Each structure stands twice: as structure tokens, then as C-alpha cells.
Amino acid sequence: MEEKIIAAIIVSAIAFFTIYVFTPILIKFLEKRNLTVKDANKIGNVMIPRPGGISIFIGIIASEITLYFFFPISEILAIIITSILGFSVGIIDDRKVMGGWFKPVALAFCAAPILLLGAYDSNLDFPLFGSVSIPSLYLALVVFMIPITGNTINSIDVLNGVASGFTT
């Protein structure tokens, strides 16, 4: 148990400090290349660099890889691959105008590592009903939950940085 607590503290610290270090570097990099957009939440012509999620992504991946070194199991590997695929979909969606169907369908395919690596348990334990095995329903839930979660996080980011507090 103590080993898991130490790993959690280290992984959390790596995520925090990676984002803390990379965000100013990313801001300068994006501003030099004039990759800025008007901030719709501020009065005047305040420009902000975009896409800023790259530093959050780097922090998440750094922490997930560190976690994998502590606990080399297929579930963590599936999360790493799913995160990379999901980020790729987000970058494509930000950079190119795609149809409304693109993001949900692409994010559904991002669930493939979870399914292919068997990073799930289709047995559910209910206090009142006991153990229930629902493999087909669980597979469908995994495929639908990745796009739902991705679009929900994207939707709640109505103010700059709200989603970053949700994800870290």
C-alpha cells in the first residue's frame, strides 16, 4: 500500500512540474510563430497562444509513462496509447475544419487499445444484486464513453483553462 502512495505522489508531482515548466516555453514558442487567437473572454484585443493543451498533454503522458514504470501492466499501457490517440484527434480537430461526425467517430476508435489489450473487467459487483457479467454491454460502453468524455471536457472549456483544472 505504501508503495502505491509513493508512486501516486511521484506521478502527481511529475504531472504538475512538467506542465508548470512546459507551459511558459509553449507560450513563447506559439507567440513567436504567431499562433495566437483573440481571447473571447476578455475586453479588447487580447491575443492568447493556441493550442495550449500541448503542455497539459506532455504532463499527462509523462505521468502515465512514469506510472507504467512503477506498475508495468497492460491497463496503463492502454491508457497511454488511448491518451496519445485522443490528443491526436483533438489536434486534428483544432487545426482543420472537420465535419461534426469526425471527432466522435475518431474518438470511438481511440478506445481500441483498451479493448485490444483487454484493459477492462466486464464483471460488475452490485451490493444488492451480486456479481454480474456483461461483456458485450461493457465493450459498447467503452466505445461510447471515450467520445462522450472527450466532448464533455471540450464543452466545459468555455473559459480559458477550465478544462485544464478538470484534467489535472
Model regions and ranges:
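"…together with the soluble PPM/PP2C metallo-phosphatase catalytic core" -> "…together
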Residues: 2-168
